Amino acid sequence: MGIKFLEVIKPFCAVLPEIQKPERKIQFREKVLWTAITLFIFLVCCQIPLFGIMSSDSADPFYWMRVILASNRGTLMELGISPIVTSDLIMQLLAGAKIIEVGDSPKDRALFNGAQKLFGMIITIGQAIVYVMTGMYGDPSEMGAGICLVIIIQLFVAGLIVLLLDELLQKGYGLGSGISLLIATNICETIVWKAFSPTTVNTGRGTEFEGAIIALFHLLATRTDKVRALREAFYRQNLPNLMNLIATVFVFAVVIYFQGFRVDLPIKSARYRGQYNTYPIKLFYTSNIPIILQSALVSNLYVISQMLSTRFSGNFIVNLLGTWSDTSTGGPARAYPVGGLCYFLSPPESFGSVLDDPVHAAIYIVFMLGSCAFFSKTWIEVSGSSAKDVAKQLKEQQMVMRGHRETSMVHELNRYIPTAAAFGGLCIGGLSVMADFLGAIGSGTGILLAVTIIYQYFEIFVKEQSEMGSMGGLFF
């Protein structure tokens, strides 16, 4: 059934826009240039408002997910990377459940990637229609069918641009992946803004600056009681404070420390005697994939819950899925879950919230740990990084594990890889929960993504440097 399904969609994949693989090796400085161009296009799209919207001042139902999904409200980047990640999530689950069987041949892999792109485009159209018809930009009946169609087309074209930018980097023209680059950029931008934002907010304590560091100097300069001013700068509520910044730096350090955990399996050449090496299996074997897929799952649940709440408010089943409330305390208007499944799957806002509702905290912990471990273990089976795939790669390179025959390599690798994937996903989920409870800026999930992505780019840079031989060879 799996192969038949991929064959059915093959004609559709053939007409999709595609970035051709480079015919020559792309130099590092060219990769940096293409990566910078990708980043520039994304940042420009984040600033271009959608044409035809009547209002985007209502409570933002997806405020909590925008940092993670590289989304910016009311702009061309309204959908961010959500369609791509959702498509990957669906295809991964279908392949993991053996509903779609993906072979090891390049043809099957290419067809699977084409199916992901096709579903990404379909999901982009679907999400655009949902956003418009649920009144996020104004009452559809007042805007008219023409304006609604124009907004949907804008969102679709922007989503297609994101798909192609991601493919551009994935094909080897740039560094890393487009998804990772856009996520890291958005999260780092948020952290810098929350630290140094000059925007003023009217609170019950008077006018304050949004940025935590700017607020520190402002409070010290304007308050006569310096001790109280310091206390407010460190612990003020509903706005970024210095404890949030300290927690963010602490989580950065912890994640970087865990990045170094790995098991080195000794391997040797089957052709040349005396040629030894090691194959590293990292603790974070699947890197940030589990947290990205978990974010996609939750964000789509939020979309469905918000859509149903708008249309069928008061319905028992809808309320069971999630009930929502609006707030504008300490920032832009936003909607947040106050009941139902969505509430229990959302992170507590602070450590105080954990103490106020320990059941919520416990369910959230179980969900995060379980989902990250599940997605991590499932991902290795569909991404070509399982024990069988690694053994095949080593065999093609004419390498064998020391003390083991070729036939027993899969069995030996199976002792490490699935365990590393599941336990690594568990650790990723645990670190995300810790960051949420400590109040790190950008959410625990966001911080985890930013650190792992930045570390990936550091490893890419080191690898390119070793291949070029020197720092000067990278750019000149």
Curated annotation (Swiss-Prot):
PROSITE patterns linked to this entry: SECY_1 (PS00755), SECY_2 (PS00756)
Keyword Transmembrane: yes
Keyword Acetylation: no
Lumenal topological segments: 54-76, 139-144, 194-240, 310-354, 442-445
Keywords: Developmental protein, Endoplasmic reticulum, Membrane, Protein transport, Translocation, Transmembrane, Transmembrane helix, Transport
SUPFAM superfamilies, per database record: Preprotein translocase SecY subunit (SSF103491)
Main location: endoplasmic reticulum
Pfam family, one: SecY
Compartments in which it is found: Endoplasmic reticulum membrane
GO biological process terms held by the UniProt record: pronephric nephron development; protein targeting to ER; protein transport
Subunit annotation: The SEC61 channel-forming translocon complex consists of channel-forming core components SEC61A1, SEC61B and SEC61G and different auxiliary components such as SEC62 and SEC63. The SEC61 channel associates with the multi-pass translocon (MPT) complex.
Function: Component of SEC61 channel-forming translocon complex that mediates transport of signal peptide-containing precursor polypeptides across the endoplasmic reticulum (ER). Forms a ribosome receptor and a gated pore in the ER membrane, both functions required for cotranslational translocation of nascent polypeptides. May cooperate with auxiliary protein SEC62, SEC63 and HSPA5/BiP to enable post-translational transport of small presecretory proteins.
Name this polypeptide is given: Protein transport protein Sec61 subunit alpha
